């Protein structure tokens, strides 16, 4: 397990933590985060971008207790917060719309606030939803073809990050993949 600092032009590995035999990944993650807080301090960064694997109330509360906000990619359509955000944003105008030049995508964003995540979490959250569209050009049999593509992303944010604009949540959510892509 690792922690990295992701910026548009720079990715820095901050720390590593092994997952012990018979140990839950979240336990190793909290050990890593506790050490990072001691080494770097609480103000080294404002928030963590967390994998969907950690969408659990107790884990997210532990991150907040360490002094950080969080955002997590929301993938599980069966979750009530996912369904509620989808229903509340349907038919609404986006709160922001732009062309993401680096990713070559057109991006409208919706921001749904004051949602209930889980009883065990106990605080409201917001969900930023993007519907990205782009044209992919391929050469097949010597001929250029253009294919329209679309993808939807949702990020859940803690209340501490409520004041950040939705485009920032979008950028931070996609920077999470800085090393892997």
Question: For each predicted feature, which ranges?
Answer:
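Conserved, well-structured functional cores that handle cations and Mg-NTP chemistry
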Residues: 1-61, 66-68
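Conserved, mostly hydrophobic/aromatic
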Residues: 180
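Residue-level signal for helical boundary/lining positions with a hydrophobic bias
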Residues: 47, 176-177
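An anionic, glycine-rich sequence signature occurring as long contiguous blocks
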Residues: 71-176
């Amino acid at each position: 397990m690792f922690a990295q600092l992701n910026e548009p032009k720079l990715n820095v590995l901050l720390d590593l933590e092994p997952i012990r035999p018979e140990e839950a990944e979240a336990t190793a993650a909290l050990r890593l985060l506790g050490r990072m807080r001691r080494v770097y301090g609480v103000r080294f960064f404002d928030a963590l971008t967390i994998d969907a694997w950690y969408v659990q109330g107790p884990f997210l509360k532990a991150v907040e207790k360490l002094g950080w906000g969080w955002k997590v990619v929301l993938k599980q359509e069966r979750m009530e917060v996912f369904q509620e955000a989808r229903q509340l944003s349907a038919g609404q105008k986006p709160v922001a719309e732009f062309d993401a030049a680096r990713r070559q995508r057109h991006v409208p964003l919706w921001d749904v606030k004051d949602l209930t995540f889980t009883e065990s979490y106990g605080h409201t959250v917001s969900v930023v939803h993007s519907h990205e569209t782009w044209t992919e050009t391929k050469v097949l049999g010597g001929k250029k073809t253009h294919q329209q593509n679309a993808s939807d992303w949702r990020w859940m944010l803690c209340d501490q990050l409520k004041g950040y604009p939705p485009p920032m949540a979008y950028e931070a959510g996609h920077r999470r993949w800085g090393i892997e892509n």
